[in-house]
Amino acid sequence: NTGVTDSFFELLKKSDADYIAFCDQDDVWLEQKVERAVDKISSFTEPTLYIGNKILVDADLNIISEGDSRSLKPGFGNALVESIGSGCTMMMNRSLAEALRLHIPKQAVIHDWWCYLAAAYLGTVVYDQKPYIWYRQHGNNEVGGSDSFFGQLKGKIRYLKKSRGKLAKQLEEFKQYYHSDEKKDRQLQELLDASAVSKRMKVVRDKTIYRQNG
């Protein structure tokens, strides 16, 4: 076993399916989960990623939360600072899978975040508010945030304080592979530059870089 992220990308290299879905061994898929995802992205020819909502449950399948609230649209400015979907809720089309195979990352924080980044940069991300999976919550429960001004402000500052480690390495590697969109390239570079305290306020004020959870 080479770890979750490396194992996923190794399997991705071996698949030639039209649609690829991620799966965790202890989650429960509800009826129509696969059909719903395919229906949502089947009309797209560009690299496309489906992300579904999820019902959080404990080890005994008692419901903790009926689903996440996403009031903001998915996009590259969001993907730069957080992953909004668990891998087990995702499905990608062949076009995205082929693009990902060209550049297998070594510094990805986690595979599902890298896929969100790539899809948001290269094509389309479809977020489905309706959950089709019971997701077992391990450890501490997720804590929701806020998309208010102050929620965004606190979230960005918290992100910037820890951006020098794995997150910065992920963005540095992503920059090496993907650099064909001038606007998105500027957003990425802005975050990398924010490791310098003097440039952090520029990111804090930039509304095109945003978090779903404060």
Residue ranges of predicted features:
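C-terminal subregions of glycosyltransferases and related glycan-biosynthesis enzymes
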Residues: 108, 114, 136-214
